[in-house]
Amino acid sequence: VHAHDWLAAPAMGWIRQGRGRKSIFTIHSTEYGRCGNNNYGGNSERIRHLEWWGCYESDAVIAVSHTLKNEVQWLYSVPDWKAGVIYNGIDYRHFDGWIEPAGVKRMYGVGPMDPTVLFVGRMVHQKGPDLLVSAIPYILQHCPNAKFVFAGDGESRWQTQEQAVHMGVSHACRFLGHVNGWRLKDLFKATDCVCVPSRNEPFGIVILEAWSAGKPVVATSVGGPSEIVWHEINGLKIDPDPESIAWGIGTLFEDFDDARWMGRNGRIAAEAVFSWDIIADEVLAVYNSI
């Protein structure tokens, strides 16, 4: 039985009970991390208990990054022999196909020659959209026609939009809410770089999506991205603070040829390291080991 995250932990235990089944528990993030590295009470405490229970009951625990593995071991006392790491994967072929970037940009009120930054993810404190907005004034000083597209929804969306208005940068921002399917893939392919400014990031699937679309990333050095991003090869690592984010984006916008080269390297990484065929073989190896 292979369960993913706390929601599936009770089902894993029920199927396993009295049947002699081996079980594996994969954790993609922790409640502690999703709460901004805080241990809250109430429902959050119940979720943490299910995470602990899944780790305790299973024969093997898989984390999606070494950083997350260390966090899980610290939180739930998982022994080394039981814990391992398998990165997330992606079907990079889903991002193949030609588009007209200028046409996609026009759909969102962005000029065809405007340097464009894409943020994709939940609009919550953990993911740091407010940090990107705080970086925009620095970037506009050197690249006044830059645009920043936010694709995602969440509890911080309206607060982040108000922040953009308060800082006088709303004219450079496009808040699209939840976007999926071909519209999201086209956004990845039309942008110039993808920013991942998270305060806590167990892995960062968005990075693999950006690379599959051939785009460089400006990604936090906190958590999983610090392991998978090769600095100045397929993106830039930054600290989760506005000045560092501005430096990363500004560096890419200073040399678009170099930025495109990083994006091509990202595509190579998606194909050679993170394809589902490779990840599936690693999971099968765990199945055969228990």
List each language-model region with its residue ranges:
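Aromatic "clamp/platform" in nucleotide-sugar-dependent glycosyltransferases that forms part
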Residues: R199
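Short hydrophobic beta-strand element within catalytic cores of glycosyltransferases
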Residues: I207, P216-A219, V229
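Conserved donor-binding/catalytic core segment of Leloir-type glycosyltransferases
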Residues: G111-K127, V133-I136
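Conserved acidic donor-binding segment of nucleotide-sugar-dependent glycosyltransferases
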Residues: H231-E232, L236-P242, T251-F256
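Short alpha-helical donor nucleotide-sugar binding micro-motif in glycosyltransferases
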Residues: H178-V179, D186-T191
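Carbohydrate-associated surface elements
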Residues: T67, G89
